[in-house]
């Protein structure tokens, strides 16, 4: 205790001393700091500077030192800087390896498609929320023909609607009871029954609430005044029901007030008959003669019989008032087979004939017709035609493709031309003109005049014309010899033919056959061709004179002129069509429905009962399948002419998918009961159905696992385009991302490229306003605009809609009409989302959208595509287009149009990116697929050179293993020579033994670590992304984690090329950066992925196989094998050599079993053009023989491609899959419906139309056609559209082909006077 007391004072003293020492040190430091600060303030630092001469000397010496050391650097004398650089690189590489730094590549974010793409609207037809009465809505929804009335007319009809209550079993009408009415079921269920010959009743259709029962043919009978009771059809209530009944007599009052509406309604009924009834029964069920009544429907020719027999044969009389003066040449040449055809055969096989007179004769006729003459139309008659979109007659003329000029310009009317007389020479292959005068008139010609006048009187009786002068100048008498083909099935320009003497045989081509069957005979007093004239649709049969025949002919234009003055003439003509239909067609007319589906509405849902089959008439449908986990997947899309739901209906299975409308669509509905009745009545229909199902199964077998139309059948003759969403595209809308996008130039370039595939129409808001009036986009004219746009789809291969830069009514219309929307942006701009895109995203737009990025020719390569796509979950794909300089030229619209006027006169470049886009949009893409095979793949580089030299375009590239490497180079490089250099450099690097030795590792997973191989691949492609490639590309790998094939279309290019080349045992599997799955060489599962390219939309796949061929001639060693015996056979030089696989070879063959089977399927498919260079002598690692192997591939490619060119394979590749390539670009430009006879174009050639009634294909093409007017007349003989570019009354008649029945005559040169017949 005492020691502790002594220590405490000492510790206290030490602490006090330490504190004093610290305080003293702090005071000293503070004092020194203050003195130092005062010293600095007292003496400021002097500011030194260089004198100017010293500065010049300093920089001069520095520059001289650089110059002095530069030569030493160039000759590598100074090793120190290079050594430092190498050391720095090695240190950085070592640090990366130690620290495992990984470069982050931009990745495409996986996004679910927008709900509007895969989901149908949940709300069905809403009656409660409408301001109209339910009965009115039901009637308007069901009866297609009523939609063609204006609102006041329709409401007036609805005044006649009555309610009828039915008990179970009660009949609406029974056989032999007249029931001229339209019935709509408000609640309950009706059954439509057909009575068989044995008296049994068959239910062909069940009518549920909201559906209707009516026969448009029966309604037409009421309208024409020929009502007749139904002999075999009855309708009864299956349960207590309430129906709405609209008597057909209510139509009479409306038609008396609005006679033009009569024309329109009759035309729609005729269109339904041809499009719905004949399409379903003939094209799909193969019925021909069963559809027509072969009994004579002739009227007695009282006037003709009263004229004395005898007439001058083979003369054509257009009138008796005026005659042609004698021309300088009595005979002119006639194109024997304009547009191409096949030689005629005996029997019903007919020669092709086009109704076009010789150019020289046409010129003389036009000169005569320019003189004023009799027959001028009545100035008080109403106007019609495309420029007059406000009248029903104008709408009817639009559908029939007839242009009736304003009566203010009588000189331009077809009817205002003086009528002439032309004689067809005796020799069928020549056409001569007969000069006549009133003084030299022969007895024969006077008799023909008498017969002509008498025949016109009989025709007046049949057509029920009140004014005989309506036929003056509009009817021609033709005398044709035996064997003459008057008109051909599929011809657009039809005429009404009234037989006076002889017979006209009517033939129709059998489905799936080259044979024609005779439908019926047209006897004296009967008409033929009136259905095609009324509807404007192509002819559904061929008309041929098997014996000498005389008949009156009224062209389509003349008939519509008559109809404009007396609309009721349509009733008599339509009645002759109905009388020609068989009783079977009348029965089926009750069962068939014409259905309109709004965008987003489901026609059926997955799991529903399959009670009918649908046929696409217009629009677009999408099929979506719901998986067990609730996820939805796109199963396919359907376009015009496709069969929908036929498989489930025939197999009586529930609906496998949900099908909804992408846009407003029209469908024909064939109930299952009606199909059963048809099969019972005509058993041959079963054979046709088996054929359809067999095609479906065969297509599925050839395709393998596909993603497209799982349950759809395409149209007759088309291929199974199962995975291509661009199949059957009819309309494409283009819209800009920003105002800087040259959208007008882009649309014109695309139209130019599409014109090489088929007739193309470009529509803009200005164009629509010019053609249809400034009020065409108003809601009042909604239906008329939709109808007119639908007609443009009928007549063109594809219609382009150019949207405005903002969300205008026209932009909304473009989106509504589009099967596919192209969003156009500039690739060199910052990735952004346009305001127009944001506005559209808020609406349910179901059309698939594609992103199109434009690039300049001299600009940088595509980059940052991933950023563009990540901003747009609604885009299903993208394309990069390298545009010519003219696209980005800053020209005013007139100058731009003037420039493209010259562009359209040249054929498009098939290798341009715009042509690639055109082929993709029309389903005509050509894919290049490269197989795996190690060093043998160097031959693919040579084949690519031959491919370019032979002019074969490539729209898609895919590959496996070495094929993935070569394909990636081809897709990235636009220059072949540069691609070859890069491929050769890489191949030379693969021969380095030192690099291979340094990459060796302990062989647990593989012999090599893969680092050296990775660096060689990365040195070729750098940081390139698959999305940035010029040509769409995919690579194939084998996912050993999921035991599945992987198709890579996005991500790091070098990564997936390396994965596709990872041979088992040599390289370790590569981990997919997306999901961590292990990826191996794609050759194990699909070494030649032609089927993948096909499923991605290719029409033709060029497949280059370089794989090794296995030895198949192996030794049969029995049921046991001794390794010692094999060792003895191998070591003993005197023993017979045996071929037995070792363990490694057996494992390799097992790995490639799936690949070999897939290769055989691809080689046997009809879409694949298989190519294999002779490279079996080279091994997998012979990369040192790059030049030699490449040359082998080049020589083989040139040989094969030359054979393709001579045999027509190349032509078949470039031909449109929906039919032969229509015209050259110039022909399409002159007349976009080049395969049709456009009467508007005919008249405009004689007299240019008023600006308000322009009938061009776009506002840009107006200027184009002005220049083409100066082309010599003889040049038009080379176009198939000749008949659409000249106008005269003789358009259909004077150009009839007069040929020997069994000979096809070559073309005659101008001035030739004779030809052997």
UniProtKB/Swiss-Prot annotation:
Lumenal compartment segments: 1-12
Catalytic site positions: 961 (nucleophile), 1081 (proton acceptor)
GO cellular component: endoplasmic reticulum; endoplasmic reticulum membrane; lipid droplet
CDD domains the record matches: CAP_ED, Pat_PNPLA6_PNPLA7
EC assignment: 3.1.1.-, 3.1.1.5
SUPFAM superfamilies listed in its UniProt record: cAMP-binding domain-like, FabD/lysophospholipase-like
Residue ranges, compositional bias (Polar residues): 1279-1288
Annotated positions binding a nucleoside 3',5'-cyclic phosphate 1: 145-272
Modified residues (Phosphoserine): 355, 1258
Residue positions of motif GXGXXG: 932-937
Segments carrying motif GXSXG: 959-963
Main location as per UniProt: endoplasmic reticulum
Location within or outside the cell: Endoplasmic reticulum membrane; Lipid droplet
Residues passing through the membrane, by range: 13-33
InterPro entries hit by this protein: Acyl_Trfase/lysoPLipase (IPR016035), cNMP-bd_dom (IPR000595), cNMP-bd_dom_sf (IPR018490), NTE (IPR050301), NTE1_P-loop_dom (IPR056556), PNPLA_dom (IPR002641), RmlC-like_jellyroll (IPR014710)
BP GO terms, sorted: phosphatidylcholine catabolic process
List of residues that carry Phosphothreonine: 1262
Motif DGA/G: chain residues: 1081-1083
Binding residue positions for a nucleoside 3',5'-cyclic phosphate 3: 591-696
Region (Disordered): 320-357, 370-392, 1271-1317
Molecular function GO labels: lysophospholipase activity
Record: residues binding a nucleoside 3',5'-cyclic phosphate 2: 458-563
Domain notes: The 3 cNMP binding domains are required for localization to the endoplasmic reticulum. The cNMP binding domain 3 is involved in the binding to lipid droplets.
Protein family: Belongs to the NTE family.
Name used for this protein in its record: Patatin-like phospholipase domain-containing protein 7
Organism in which the protein naturally occurs: Homo sapiens (Human)
